[in-house]
Curated annotation (Swiss-Prot):
Annotated signal sequence range: 1-20
Cysteine pairings via disulfide bonds: none
UniProt family annotation: Belongs to the glucagon family.
Site description Cleavage, residues in chain: 52-53, 83-84, 91-92, 97-98, 130-131, 145-146
PANTHER family: GLUCAGON (PTHR11418), PRO-GLUCAGON (PTHR11418:SF0)
Pro-piece positions: 84-89, 131-145
PROSITE patterns in the cross-refs: GLUCAGON (PS00260)
Superkingdom classification of source: Eukaryota
Gene3D superfamilies: 6.10.250.590
Description of what induces expression: Glucagon release is stimulated by hypoglycemia and inhibited by hyperglycemia, insulin, and somatostatin. GLP-1 and GLP-2 are induced in response to nutrient ingestion.
Name this protein carries in UniProt: Pro-glucagon
Subcellular location: Secreted
Keyword annotations of the record: Amidation, Cleavage on pair of basic residues, Hormone, Phosphoprotein, Secreted, Signal
Length: 180
């Protein structure tokens, strides 16, 4: 009698095991999609298994898409900051690397801007040198020796100075369209 119960229990376990699809089987060998849609509707376990598999595939593909999208957005941001070079981008860049290996900082950029402003102011004033008044400049140029040993001529110095002033005045007074 015990053997009949044992055989019946074993038979019930086999039937119950055939109804359930273990997770290991579905992961190791993918199910073929040659079954028709009517077969899938008939077997609810099959529908749950395929649904779980498709959700996992979708989640995996979606996370890969999000990763590539984030990487693409980061590259676009980098390109825009390099292209625009606006104040926000300069604030984040401590140094800008040049091909010859030198670095320029925000301080040197500021100093270059200041030097440009001083040069424009110097052009507007029309002076020969930035640091010295006109009289001192003329005296220094008279005392300076050329490479061949002769002294600079006072007349040439004065004419050069006047020509420079006339040129700067012409630049300031004429419009850009008139210069062409």
């Amino acid at each position: 009698m015990k053997s009949i119960y044992f055989v019946a229990g074993l038979f019930v376990m086999l039937v119950q095991g055939s109804w359930q699809h273990p997770l290991q089987d579905t992961e190791e060998k993918p199910r073929s999609f040659s079954t028709s849609q009517t077969d899938l509707l008939d077997d609810p376990d099959q529908m749950n298994e395929d649904k779980r598999h498709s959700q996992g595939t979708f989640t995996s593909d979606y996370s890969k898409f999000l990763d590539t999208r984030r990487a693409q957005d980061f590259l676009d941001w980098l390109k825009n900051t390099k292209r625009n070079r606006n104040e926000i981008a300069k604030r984040h860049d401590e140094f800008e690397r040049h091909a010859e290996g030198t670095f320029t900082s925000d301080v040197s950029s500021y100093l270059e801007g200041q030097a440009a402003k001083e040069f424009i102011a110097w052009l507007v004033k029309g002076r020969g040198r930035r640091d010295f008044p006109e009289e001192v400049t003329i005296v220094e140029e008279l005392r300076r020796r050329h490479a061949d040993g002769s002294f600079s001529d006072e007349m040439n110095t004065v004419l050069d100075h006047l020509a420079t002033k006339d040129f700067i005045n012409w630049l300031i007074q004429t419009k850009i369209t008139d210069r062409k």
